[in-house]
Amino acid sequence: MSRPLPYHIHFFSGLLTCWILCTSSAHKCTVRHEVADCSHLKLTQIPDDLPTNITVLNLTHNQLRRLPPANFTRYSQLTTLDGGFNSISKLEPELCQSLPWLEILNLQHNEISQLSDKTFIFCMNLTELHLMSNSIQKIKNDPFKNLKNLIKLDLSHNGLSSTKLGTQLQLENLQELLLSNNKISSLTPGEFDFLGNSSLKRLELSSNQIKEFSPGCFHTLGELSGLSLNNAKLSPSLTEKLCLELSNTSIENLSLSSNQLDTISHTTFDGLKQTNLTTLDLSRNSLRVMGNDSFAWLPHLEYLSLEYNNIEHLSSRSFYGLSNLRRLDLRRSFTRQSISLTSLPKIDDFSFQWLKCLEYLNMDDNNFPGIKRNTFTGLVRLKFLSLSNSFSSLRTLTNETFLSLAGCPLLLLDLTKNKISKIQSGAFSWLGHLEVLDLGLNEIGQELTGQEWRGLDNIVEIYLSYNKYLELTTNSFTSVPSLQRLMLRRVALKNVDCSPSPFRPLPNLVILDLSNNNIANINDELLKGLEKLEILDLQHNNLARLWKHANPGGPVQFLKGLFHLHILNLGSNGFDEIPVEAFKDLRELKSIDLGMNNLNILPQSVFDNQVSLKSLSLQKNLITSVQKTVFGPAFRNLSYLDMRFNPFDCTCESIAWFVNWINITHTNISELSNHYLCNTPPQYHGYPVMLFDVSPCKDSAPFELLFMININILLIFIFIVLLIHFEGWRISFYWNVSVHRVLGFKEIDRAEQFEYAAYIIHAYKDRDWVWKHSSPMEDEDHTLRFCLEERDFEAGVLELEAIVNSIRRSRKIIFVVTQNLLKDPLCKRFKVHHAVQQAIEQNLDSIILIFLEEIPDYKLNHALCLRRGMFKSHCILNWPVQKERVNAFHHKLKVALGSRNSAH
């Protein structure tokens, strides 16, 4: 019999298993869509547990020293292998034999120093080979000769001193060769002979200290269209020599950024006259002097970059010959500082006259003294002009400032950061095609009369944000009815509440920004007529008073009529109230920002019409309760919610529904775990809202329906009781009338002949009442006849005998019960006694009691030996106090008179 293992052995075996699992999980690759990512896992060998059908394997940022071919045999479908940022020092030829479909091989940032003829012998399908940032100092023989399909070869950041990568023709499909950041110092004839049959398009030689371009060094590269020699310390003379060597080539793009080209002249680019150069980058060269006709040899040039230079003077012939130029970048090209205007960089009149095809001109961040009458003359196709932070003394825009742009189809004009303080009437009258005007970040301080925009017939956007102050008038924008976007952020806006509204002439307005203006007074017609408005920014103002119910005249409904509004920003306005109809017309609203206000309790139906709401921001308010009746409609289709930093009251009544909604919603809730904290009650202070336990709240949930049912039943019962109490007689009356009109009053009785319908027993003092109410009934119904002592007793007959005879000849006996009856000796001793005795002897239910007063049962029994329980309910009648019930009483009496006498 085997003995069980000791407990501590089980314990340590469990720890070992856990350590193995944790170790393996720490080195777990991510596989998705046939792509395996094994990067940053500190791997020292190739994983052997990946799916065999992967096509991409990422092994970057590990500790691999080799790529053993045997380890890749199971991954024969690989097309991309990335082994960058490892410590691989050697490539084995069999690697590509194990990966016959490999197309991209990336081995950047490794320790490879040598490449043999056999290294890539089996890599015939390779299209990209990345070997940058290794230790390759020299290419011996022909390691790339079998790479017939290679398109891109990257050998940058190595120690190569020559561009010669082979001894025989090869790489016939190569299009990109990257050799930047090496130690190449000269380009001599024959170095590119190995590419004699190639289709090389781009050659990257940047950051090489090249000092010589030997004659014919590029002639082998017949299809070369792009050459980069950035940061190569090329001098003007060496640049001129380079251009001569590029003569009669297919060069189209030439990048010479960050060199030592401080001067260019008529001869600098002379060698390029036999080319079709379209792009030239001369940025960051500390260029000071641009001689006349410097670009005369470049008639095909379309893009010229001169940014980040220090040009001193632009003459009328500086751009001569650039008849096809479409884009000119002069950003930070004229940056010389001087306290004297005469020493500032100069732009002569007609300097741009040769640029007939120019469409884009960027002159940002320069130091021009101003704009002359003919500065931009000749730019007949200019569409985009950027002059941000370009002038040192452009304080006022006059009607002559842009005279030189008259007639050009300018669409965008950027004048930001120029310290402009005033816009005169008609300043833009020459720019009839302008669509976007940016005047932000200046020092404009004036009243807008509307004449400033005269002539802007096609304007779409005016940006005036971040200026000194702007005072509006009714006519401020009457000249620009086509305006769609108006930005007036942080301009100390004045007179916003003028009437009619300054924005009323803008029926096409789509975006309006009035934020950061400390606006406190606006009227309900401010946005009237802006039916196309989609975005409204009013944050960082002081509009709290407008929505208070205590506001004189009530809350100001300034959002009414904005039927197509999509985005509304009302943050930081101090709101502590929201009118119930504030958002009534905003049915297409998609985003509301009410953050950083003082909101606590919101009206229940405030969001009922926001059926399209996708984003709701209520952060940093005083909201304690999030209930379904308020937020349910708003949360229905929500994609983003921000209610951070609110003092939530973590009770069932306040947030139970909210917590349940959080647990089931797919809405993006910003920083839910950290900034949605309970404030009250004290035991939950600082506790995350999402962790609030709602299970105690659910205990009452099953009884909610029962509670509602009980409430409804109780209300119905109370209603019925009140109805019966106040109108029961009427209901009974109409019911009895309906029934007896169909069935009649008299029930079937045994065949007996009675002379009277009823004999009425009453006290002598009640005779007037009896006569008053019995006679009308007899007149109304001739078949009905009562026996009345004063009228129907036979003359000469003893009273007692007459009473007995009358009772015998009457079908019913009516007692008119009053206090008088209880005290009447004759009634008590004879009439009542005899009537009851006859009814008992004949086994009849023939007695009807009519109570004219409220007589307790015990008094009735004491005086007449009668109780109400001795008679049928329909034979006990009470005389009504209300006159309108008399008819109902008469009807009940007729029913009682017509009822059957038999007791069985």
From Swiss-Prot:
Residues 727-904 are cytoplasmic. It is found in: Endoplasmic reticulum membrane; Endosome membrane; Early endosome. InterPro entries: Cys-rich_flank_reg_C, Leu-rich_rpt, Leu-rich_rpt_typical-subtyp, LRR_dom_sf, SLRP, TIR_dom, TLR3_TMD, Toll_tir_struct_dom_sf. It is a single-pass type I membrane protein. It comes from the Eukaryota. It holds the Pfam family TIR. This is Toll-like receptor 3. The gene is TLR3.
